[in-house]
Amino acid sequence: MSQDLKVDWVEVGPRDGLQSWPRTLPTPAKVGLVAGLLDCGFRRVEATSMVHPKWVPQLADAEAVLEALQDRIDQLRVLVPNRRGLDRARDAGVRNVAVTVAATDGYNEHNLNRSVRETLEEIQVIAQEARRDNIAVDASVSVAFGCPYDGAVAPERVGEVASALADGGIEEISLADTIGVANPAQVEALFQAMKERLPAVRWGAHFHDTRGTAIANLLSALETGVNLFEGSVGGIGGSPFAPGAAGNICSEDALAMLDAMGIATGVDVARLIAVARGLERTLDAPLPGRIHTLAPAEIGTVPA
């Protein structure tokens, strides 16, 4: 693995991490969390989602959060589940949105209340409208490694969905292990297949840690040339529509490892650990991450 390797890390804790948390954080606490993460050096933070509050009440204050962060809006990404979500994001001044579609109809119906085909059709329209307004669009394919409703997912199926996204003009696609069932060999095989099928796409990875394999899966993806990852401060997260799934790969745990390997990330890990500890106090609950629990209490250097 090249020592000159650089990794781009998208911090999704404020959205993916908080969307299924049992208690809703006050808006000022969310704003403070996003600002604190940006201060760590993240170039992109997924701040919220334009989902209907009926489905995810924890993110009902999306516009208020974005209004409070207008001076840093160019560093924020927002999940938009549909065209109405894009309209809301545009009105809020957002310059980068994320769209998602499942590799299976079973999960897509639970998550977005429509079929994969219908979602892909809407994403094409979203991408066209976003390009018209100079808004960048990133995409993810959820349950790419296994589905809680439809079971095993064939690589060919993932490729078909990803190809439809690429045909719609989307250049950055992340494959998500939404329920945390992937293993390193599967990760390597799927990313190699996708890179051969769609070499012009920039591929990213989004892992959950249900079986404790997220870090190993990250390294496997890294070996295939993937250098774009998503994770969550403290390891919080999980989809309301993926029963039993654990949180996202823990950002500070993974980034500390990458730093120790000499891989550049641009993120101040010591500062991120402090943010994780502050979030743990705010949530008044232990977080799944590990490194933030280590001494010294006030991080000066990150233990190897």
Which role fits each region the language model picked out?
Residues 1-304:
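Catalytic cores and adjacent flexible loops of soluble metabolic enzymes
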